[in-house]
């Protein structure tokens, strides 16, 4: 196997069949699966996140599942560091990293790098706001052009939010924001990825799968799971990232009597559809190969693409889905 860090990325919207396809690939290749899902990191949240079953996880090693409490948070920066470490570790064991999930921000961090930008500073922000109120944003844009011409050249002189952030980064770090972003992309360029994105040929197909999966989760005891979470973690609130996972807020509010069971199901399914729509929007912005999730024999075609990737060949052009999604 190549010494260059390399991995297969299998992304796609919720309920598009990623887990099943990943397990099919695990039967053909010596893979270890790394979850790319901001919901699967939480312990005790199994049903509502459609976490792989114990049997599925026993089929091959899985990583980044059940790593934190629902009271904690997990950032894209943490994922980026963990994924880079795991890719290296898995490859050192002679295995192939297979990254699977639907958190597109995490994929963006892998494919485009994660820039080491400084955190916002309240005092500097207030100072820049005062300058802008006095001078106007075109003058602040001219100031940015002196410090970071590359960033200024792509911003409208009245784009206050982005000019503000670019100036803040320059003044806090002592470096142009464009330089810091380029460094992140340079680090990402040291990896070889085969980015495969499952997309639905028909939106109705995906919507039907979403509704069916929500029905199955209810049969499996999703509402009981939410009750157990609330009992086990008294500090849990709807403001925590874990409870922003699709379905959990709706279940919580249903249990609190805000609406009945039928409306809870409608809201849960609708929220999942909205998530899928956002995931597909993200997918269009990423440099990934769109693949028809409804295509017959898809597992074999993806396996052939992995064979080509490992041999240093480009995937067959026939794999790429040319339609709208």
UniProtKB/Swiss-Prot annotation:
Binding site for substrate: 14-19
Keywords for this protein: ATP-binding, Magnesium, Nucleotide-binding, Transferase, tRNA processing
Annotated stretches, region: Interaction with substrate tRNA: 37-40, 161-165, 244-249
Chain positions recorded as ATP binding sites: 12-19
Catalytic activity annotation: adenosine(37) in tRNA + dimethylallyl diphosphate = N(6)-dimethylallyladenosine(37) in tRNA + diphosphate
Cofactor: Mg(2+)
GO MF annotation list: ATP binding; tRNA dimethylallyltransferase activity
Keyword Acyltransferase in annotation: no
Coiled coil: none
Purpose of the protein: Catalyzes the transfer of a dimethylallyl group onto the adenine at position 37 in tRNAs that read codons beginning with uridine, leading to the formation of N6-(dimethylallyl)adenosine (i(6)A).
Protein name as catalogued: tRNA dimethylallyltransferase
High-level lineage: Bacteria, Pseudomonadati, Pseudomonadota, Betaproteobacteria, Neisseriales
Gene, per the UniProt record: miaA
């Amino acid at each position: 196997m190549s010494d260059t860090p390399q991995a297969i990325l299998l992304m796609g919207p919720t309920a598009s069949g990623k887990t099943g396809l990943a397990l099919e690939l695990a039967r053909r290749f010596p893979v270890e699966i790394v979850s790319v899902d901001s919901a699967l990191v939480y312990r005790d949240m199994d049903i509502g996140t459609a976490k792989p079953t114990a049997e599925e996880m026993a089929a091959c090693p899985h990583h980044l599942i059940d790593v934190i409490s629902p009271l904690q948070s997990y950032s894209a920066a943490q994922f980026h560091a963990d994924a880079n470490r795991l890719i290296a570790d898995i490859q050192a064991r002679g295995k192939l990293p297979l990254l699977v999930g639907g958190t597109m921000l995490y994929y963006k961090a892998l494919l485009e790098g994660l820039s080491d930008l400084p955190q916002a500073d309240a005092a500097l922000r207030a100072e820049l706001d005062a300058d802008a109120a006095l001078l106007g944003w075109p003058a602040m844009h001219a100031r940015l052009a002196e410090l970071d011409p590359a960033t200024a050249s792509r911003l409208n002189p009245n784009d206050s939010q982005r000019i503000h952030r670019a100036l803040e980064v320059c003044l806090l770090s002592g470096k142009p924001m464009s330089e810091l972003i380029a460094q992140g992309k340079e680090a990402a360029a040291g990896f070889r990825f085969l980015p495969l994105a499952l997309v639905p040929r028909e939106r109705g197909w995906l919507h039907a799968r979403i509704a069916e999966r929500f029905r199955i989760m209810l049969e499996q005891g999703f509402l009981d799971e939410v009750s157990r979470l609330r009992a086990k973690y008294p500090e849990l609130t709807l403001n925590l990232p874990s409870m922003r996972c699709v379905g959990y807020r709706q279940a919580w509010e249903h249990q609190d009597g805000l609406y009945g069971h039928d409306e809870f199901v409608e809201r849960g399914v609708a929220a999942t559809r909205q998530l899928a729509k956002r995931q597909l929007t993200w997918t269009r912005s990423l440099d990934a190969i769109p693949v028809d999730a409804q295509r017959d024999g898809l597992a074999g075609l993806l396996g052939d693409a992995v064979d080509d990737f490992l041999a240093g060949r480009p995937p067959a052009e026939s794999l790429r889905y040319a339609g709208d999604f």
